[in-house]
């Protein structure tokens, strides 16, 4: 467990715009500034499904460039075809780092879902937004399409990703 050292507190300054940490007593630099903190709600725009109106309000917290989002997807309708299930994000994601994916950490808990997949996980893709990746034993990876989710399936989703700014 790390602790905040007292010398770090002495070298911390606050202004109307930022909280700055100076670890060596020298001039403060932008890399050590926490100038952006925000929390709120937003309504994701979904493709491939229509979310139950009671679950349209998702939450987010943004600290610096890290954004954590969470909410519930319970489709009230699907296009029941090969349309990818995806949504926009409250903040533009950073450029892709590897394999076309942005830095993402997330999880999905499900209820009332009848899938033959080994698992699902949310991913963030620059220029696309949030997609749900399906994991199939010995068959690779794919993206969830509207025909693989049914009305009233419940997906509780949490994702942390890097924003562009």
Model-found features: residue ranges?
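A short, structural micro-pattern
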Residues: 3, 21, 83, 126, ...
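Substrate-binding and catalytic surfaces of secreted/luminal carbohydrate-active proteins
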Residues: 67
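Beta-strand-rich, repetitive solenoid scaffolds
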Residues: 4-13, 18-23, 28-35, 58-61, ...
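Glycine-rich, low-complexity segments
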Residues: 3-52, 94-99, 105-107, 156-165
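Surface-exposed ligand/attachment interfaces on beta-rich extracellular proteins
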Residues: 11-17, 39-63, 72-97, 141-151
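Domain-scale recognition of soluble eukaryotic interaction modules
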Residues: 120, 126-165
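Terminal beta-strand-rich extracellular "head" domains
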Residues: 73-129, 133
